Regions:
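Nucleotide-activated chemistry modules centered on ATP-dependent adenylation/adenylyltransferase
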Residues: 1-265
Length: 265
């Protein structure tokens, strides 16, 4: 198992370094969840204890209080160049989307404004293929149009470790260092490396958050897993999907693909 984690770590660090070398200026998106926090940890390893790019939180104002407290604490501890990008109100999102997806689409609009204003050519994002069916169609380096749109039918091939090395004219690329990781990989790596996490991931009074999102579209699951060891043991036996607590994911699969096609993470 340690060999598997070492291989995943080495690949992720190589992807991060390549992105910084090929696509500057680069930013890193941080939701404060376990995956993007693990990505920041890997970036610190890649650059000898520092993160040499801005770390961006797309802020809807709807995160749980514990998540904001974690953000502020870790930003100080790791000396992050944290940029908090306020997302536009929900009525700026596509009105034809279902209600929960429309709430999530605020982050798409916030990211679009950020990229247009600050000129980033690449954004590092901590998504994984196994967490959602539409994300399973992604690439490690994913080209985006000028408006951030993603075409699932026009993804570049990635054979034998080859990834895209050019940025589309007027567009940007999303770089996904954790794409091949699983939920269990992230938790095992978090345990091995003692990476900080939001306490809400651990059970209290029979409930915990398996996936963290905005408080208006995320609910906790029933669980007694009050430690990372217990979370790993729980995941080794569960058949429930990771995002079962995300109300957005109970809308149609087509809704999430529309969100991602429009530029959502």
């Amino acid at each position: 198992m340690n060999d598997d984690l070492n291989a995943l770590e080495a690949h992720a660090i190589a992807v991060i370094r390549d992105a910084h070398r090929l696509f500057a200026p680069v930013c890193a998106l941080w939701s404060m969840g376990k995956d993007s926090t693990a990505m920041l940890w890997l970036m610190r390893k890649a650059f000898v204890g520092e993160i040499p790019v801005p770390v961006v939180q797309l802020d809807t104002g709807m995160e749980l209080p514990e998540v904001y407290a974690f953000r502020d604490r870790l930003a100080r501890a790791w000396s992050l160049d944290l940029r908090v990008e306020a997302c536009p109100p929900e009525d700026a999102a596509d009105p034809t989307l279902p209600p929960q997806s429309r709430a999530a689409a605020r982050k798409t609009e916030g990211l679009r404004a950020l990229l247009a204003r600050d000129g980033y050519r690449a954004a590092l994002v901590g998504i994984r293929r196994d967490e959602q069916a539409t994300r399973a169609k992604e690439r490690v380096v994913s080209p985006r149009a000028m408006d951030g749109a993603w075409s699932v039918r026009e993804q570049p091939p990635e054979f034998w470790g080859y990834s895209l090395t050019d940025v589309p004219h007027g567009g940007h690329v999303r770089v996904h260092p954790l794409l091949a990781w699983t939920e269990l990989d992230v938790w095992r790596y978090t345990r091995r490396e003692s990476i900080p996490i939001v306490p809400l991931y651990l059970a209290r009074d029979g409930l915990r958050y398996r996936s963290l999102g905005e408080k208006n579209i995320t609910v906790p699951i029933a669980s007694d897993a009050a430690s990372i060891d217990a979370v790993i043991a729980e995941l080794e036996s569960t058949r429930e999907p990771e995002r079962a607590g995300r109300t957005m994911d109970h809308e149609s699969e087509a809704s999430f693909e529309r969100l991602r096609s429009g530029g959502y993470m």
